[in-house]
Amino acid sequence: MITGIQITKAANDDLLNSFWLLDSEKGEARCIVAKAGFAEDEVVAVSKLGDIEYREVPVEVKPEVRVEGGQHLNVNVLRRETLEDAVKHPEKYPQLTIRVSGYAVRFNSLTPEQQRDVIARTFTESL
């Protein structure tokens, strides 16, 4: 459980009146704000705070969307034969547009190497 606290008494003067979030399950404390000695968002073991007295403060948690990593998907609805024919006969496909790395690009404007790469990456036999 997460508890918000304001330190009211401490051997370390840097901790006096600082605000922390205590995670009782992990035995950790996250610094919200301190005069000195601790960085904002720094996580330390509760034991590092030493002998302290504190008062609990209400904590309001707002949902936060945090995206770390993730994947990117380009969808091109085409047949392999269409792209292969566009490589051989670009004049027949002047408006053929595909998605590459999130951008729309004319297939004919790609280099031959890029065209081969798109064909190789786009079509698979199975998942």
UniProtKB/Swiss-Prot annotation:
The family database entries (PROSITE patterns) matched by this protein are listed as:
GLY_RADICAL_1 (PS00850), GLY_RADICAL_2 (PS51149)
Residue ranges annotated for the Glycine radical domain, each copy included: 5-127
Which Pfam families does this entry report, sorted A to Z? Gly_radical (PF01228)
Residues modified as Glycine radical? G102
Query: What are the entry keywords?
Result: Acetylation, Organic radical
Q: Which domain of life is it from?
A: Bacteria
Q: Which GO terms describe its molecular function?
A: formate C-acetyltransferase activity
Residues annotated with N6-acetyllysine modification: K48, K88, K92
Question: What is a single cellular component term in the Gene Ontology annotation?
Answer: cytosol
* NCBIfam families linked: spare_glycyl
Q: What does this protein do?
A: Acts as a radical domain for damaged PFL and possibly other radical proteins.
This protein is called what? Answer: Autonomous glycyl radical cofactor
**Originating organism:** Escherichia coli O1:K1 / APEC
